A protein has these predicted regions:
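C-terminal extensions
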Residues: 1-31, 35-90
Length: 90
């Protein structure tokens, strides 16, 4: 996970927002995120539905690359839309 964490510098947390481990949501609630991907997101500093809901297209691609996921998968699985909806339900 250290290799993944080093890629966090390429992600704009000014847009995503900053969260801590204490604030983490169960990201596996989002379709397309399993335990291994959730751990990779946590390693990047992405802990909450709100952060995922704040992703722009560019950030989706950066996250996709950082977690070494199939190209376009974050967008195709609509993580941003799901993150927004789950954050509103909290």
């Amino acid at each position: 996970m250290e290799r993944i964490a080093q890629k966090a510098d390429g992600i704009d947390f000014g847009i995503l927002g900053v969260a801590t481990l204490d604030e983490k949501d169960d990201l596996q609630t989002i379709k397309g995120i399993g335990p291994f991907i959730a751990e990779k997101l946590y390693a990047l500093g992405i802990y909450t539905f709100e952060q995922i809901g704040n992703m722009t297209s560019d950030i989706e691609e950066e996250v996709n690359k950082a977690i070494e996921f199939f190209p376009g998968r974050v967008k195709r699985d609509e993580w941003t839309k799901q993150g927004r909806e789950l954050h509103k339900k909290k």
